[in-house]
Amino acid sequence: MTEVSMSLTGHLKELRTRLLIILLSFFLAFFVGLFVSKPLILFLQKDDLPKEVILHVFKVTDAFQIYIEMAFIIGLILVFPVILYQLWAFVKPGLHASEQRITLRYIPITFLLFLCGVVFSYVITFPFILKFMFQFAAELGVETTIGLATYFQFLLQIVLSFGVLFELPMVIMLLTRLSLITPNGMRRARKYAYFCLLIIAAFIAPPEILSHLMITIPLIGLYEISIVVSGFTVRRMDKEMNMKKML
């Protein structure tokens, strides 16, 4: 067997081991989610909804479906740091010692950004959209009837989307380090980026202008923060390059 094929076999075994660890970790996290899901669903109903609004089930399977979906989402969130670490461990042999230290720091920051997106959308964006919709329905003299599945799927759509989108600064930092983008390039592409963010917000928000703005504005803020992050990364890379030249 050649050295290349042995190396390939070793990488495949390593990949299988990492995937197995992720899979087992997810099953454990999903098991935890089964215990947490029910009290979390009860809390979210009491915390978000006005007292006069009652959730309904329109299909026999709705309640159980949401229970399993919530447990699945909890499992994914809990296993997210494990996925990041296993990914880092897989590519670690191909990195220099300094790169290993830097990229390892990305793991807690990435997870923290995801949680910040979830918390931000749950505390600010989602309540605003919900309050506006209920008030608008009341002004029209319409009684609000919400399905359990529809409500929680909408909630998850908002908070998970924001969790993912809050990773933008980290993605920009990585792309900047790979010399794929620059802060000046991001500034020049600002109007195109804003247009793309408007389209992304349209997929997340209901078809209503205020709700759409409540999602678009934070996304634009994230883009501007990402430009700053990209600039900081470029300056740091230049500093590292100058230090290497001095050695």
From Swiss-Prot:
Keywords per UniProt: Cell membrane, Membrane, Protein transport, Translocation, Transmembrane, Transmembrane helix, Transport
Any one GO molecular-function label of the UniProt entry: proton motive force dependent protein transmembrane transporter activity
Pfam families listed in its UniProt record: TatC (PF00902)
UniProt subcellular location: Cell membrane
GO process terms (BP): intracellular protein transmembrane transport; protein transport by the Tat complex
Residue intervals passing through the bilayer: 21-41, 71-91, 109-129, 154-174, 195-215
Origin: domain of life: Bacteria
GO terms for cellular component: TAT protein transport complex
Membrane topology summary: Multi-pass membrane protein
HAMAP family: TatC
PANTHER family assigned to the protein according to its UniProt record, in alphabetical order: SEC-INDEPENDENT PROTEIN TRANSLOCASE PROTEIN TATC, SEC-INDEPENDENT PROTEIN TRANSLOCASE PROTEIN TATC, CHLOROPLASTIC-RELATED
Subunit structure: Forms a complex with TatA.
Family that this chain belongs to: Belongs to the TatC family.
Protein's job: Part of the twin-arginine translocation (Tat) system that transports large folded proteins containing a characteristic twin-arginine motif in their signal peptide across membranes.
Protein name as it appears in the record: Sec-independent protein translocase protein TatC
Top-level taxonomy: Bacteria, Bacillati, Bacillota, Bacilli, Bacillales
